[in-house]
Amino acid sequence: MPTFASMDEKGAPDMNPEQWANAVYDPLNKAVDEGRLVIANKAPITGLGEGWWITPGTIEKIPEIKGMTAVEILEHPEWFPFKEDPSKGAFHGCPAGWGCQLANANLFKAFEMEKKGWVLIDPGSAAGLDGSISKAAESGNPWFGYYWNPTSIVGKYDLQPVPWGIDFCR
């Protein structure tokens, strides 16, 4: 966000090669509409993004999960026991202060995940989120949560994206 804020307020730097536009969606569109910024290439890389993922160990331990959508997985918090209260499911969210934190918190609320028996885990930092994935993947335990790609974690642990199962853009 600091690079975007500097560009928007000071006009420098001239170029931002990697901006997650969804993290600054409204102010970016306003800056473009007002002529302060220009989007030179709207989609330089395809097939990338962010979303909800599971580890291959999840599929090995819960074979029926293969091909399921997020909406279907949300009916099974028992597959991802929360350490502090195993009667609830653990969903690993986005680190505090990141743009994706609000999006994931809103999805958690919109999908009524708490009512379904889920707990939204704040990993505290990118390292905390990576650590939760590494620990689950290396031990073969189920893991369900937010992540993005391309990243070394997605490649190293062969994380599997979970389709939403609903159409967000009608």
Regions found by a protein language model. Name each.
Residues 1-34, 131-135, 152-158:
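Pocket-flanking alpha-helical
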Residues 4-10, 27, 31, 76-80, ...:
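Structured segments of extracytoplasmic/periplasmic soluble domains
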Residues 24-93:
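A conserved helix-loop-strand patch within extracytoplasmic ligand-binding domains
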Residues 18, 92-169:
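Ligand-binding pocket segment of bilobal, Venus flytrap-like solute-binding proteins
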